[in-house]
Amino acid sequence: MIENSFKMEMHFKNRWQAASLFLRYPRTVTLCLSGKSGDMDESVNLSTSMGDVEASMLNHNVSFSSTMVTSNGDLSLPKLSVTLSAEEILKLRSGRPKNAVESPHAGVPMETSLAAEEEANGDEEEESVRVVDIEDTLELTSNGNEAKPEDQELAIAPVLQYFQGALVELGRRCWTSSTEAQHYTKGCYWSPDGTCLLVPVHLDGMHVIEMPSDLYSADTVQPARSLTKLQSEVHVPEGGTVYDCVWYPHMNSLQPETCLWLATRQHEPIHMWDAFDGSLRCSYSGYDAVDEVMAAISLAFSHDGEQIYAGYKRCIKIFDTSRPGRFCDDYPVKFAISCIAQTTAHPHTLTCGNWHGYIQHFDLRCSHKQGPLFTLGGHKGGITQLRYGEFGNGEWHLFSGARKCDKILQWDMRNYKQPLVELQRHVDTNQRIQFDLASDSNWLASGDTRGFVNVWDLKKYGDPSVLPLHSDCCNGVALNPAMPILATSSGQFHFTDQSAQGDNVTLNGTETTELPAPADVNQNQKEVLYENAVVMWWCGQTG
């Protein structure tokens, strides 16, 4: 309540003037409509109204649904008149509780009270500066040197050195295949803290594999290190073909509530899975025009983790992470969204790839009728992956890959008329072949259908280093964000003739099974080589 004897008139043309006054003077005054100051029952608390206005401004989100557009009539407030008479002030004073604390500036003019408060704030700032003065907090040792805090060295993240020598295999996990069930991997994804690896497997769900425990504190690895048999700590059984999956960006194994990932599967809504026990936490459902559940094609978290971007055949749905269910904002598009990428510098824009081979950049604050801000081409197949890399001074480069396309295109987003660099790899199938960028944006690694891993040094832009790591298609490549460890996954769907019973089938490159052939079947034999594996490699310094 106001304790000062003053009288003022305020007229607001709109809510923005009222909100600006409230932010400058966040006090509680009495608001009377139509200039009626004598009747206190008709008064309205201005702080409550201005609080609602401020919350309305701060929560003013862009709506992508035509039914959620706010009319212009809702953006204006009637002219308000505020009048405080001496009788009202006395009435307010007499109505205070008995145990109320008397303000030290009660009964003085408002200008004097504000001056006293500013002087008190100045004294507090001087006292605060004196208390936290850096000279008072330094500790000196006996020889006069300044003592360093114990955690100062831990606060500085070490610079990871990738590909400093020959790769050392750390461990692997294999899945068998047959002509009836081909369990090939579909990529691999390191968690943001680098402790575990997510591996989707065809007809076998999703697996979470932990990094070997002896590597957490390792600076170097001996070439003669014994192999670790990688095991699945969490297994989510197959419920449908996995289209895409993504980790929560702030995942930390020391905080179990953050250990989760999203996955979209065939004929299912988006599911959030717990990385500790594999339980289902919640679901985010997208529905079509006839109210049937649609499966998302691609997924992405916002960098703060508060929103989920899901790409569908004709729209982008934006879910609030804290609100599971079907409530979302729709942003209509013309093509199916096959992959999504975003920069930290522009949280309101999305870069999306589609099955027609185009890359489109959308500003979600604009109407969908405006269309994309720009469209990029250059690939002959559908876009399978997009990845942004920061090269310092706010310089963002976009890397794009496509199916049945041997090129990885690097785009400078300051001038995107043509690609900056074309990086060549070998991709001759429709399968998604992953590539990954190092945390310092100095190295780019990609698999190919021949089983090789191509590594480019982005500081030199020379020919890639070709590493023959697999005997089957290398579909997944992931660089650990916390350790110099490279994870690769292999496997693909092999087209075999079910009637050709005389084929030689090789499982994971270790054993060969020759099936008997009946007399009436052609004896032409065909060798089919399967290698469905995920392997971890040490790519740092070796001892």
Swiss-Prot record:
Transmembrane segments: none
GO molecular function: box C/D sno(s)RNA binding; protein-RNA adaptor activity; RNA binding
Placement of WD repeats on the sequence: 237-283, 291-329, 378-421
Keyword Nucleotide-binding: no
Composition bias, Acidic residues: 116-127
Residues covered by region (Disordered): 95-128
PANTHER family recorded: TELOMERASE CAJAL BODY PROTEIN 1 (PTHR13211:SF0)
Entry function: RNA chaperone that plays a key role in Cajal body formation. Specifically recognizes and binds the Cajal body box (CAB box) present in both small Cajal body RNAs (scaRNAs). Probably acts by mediating localization of scaRNAs to Cajal bodies.
Entry protein name: Telomerase Cajal body protein 1 homolog
Lineage of the species this protein comes from: Eukaryota, Metazoa, Ecdysozoa, Arthropoda, Hexapoda
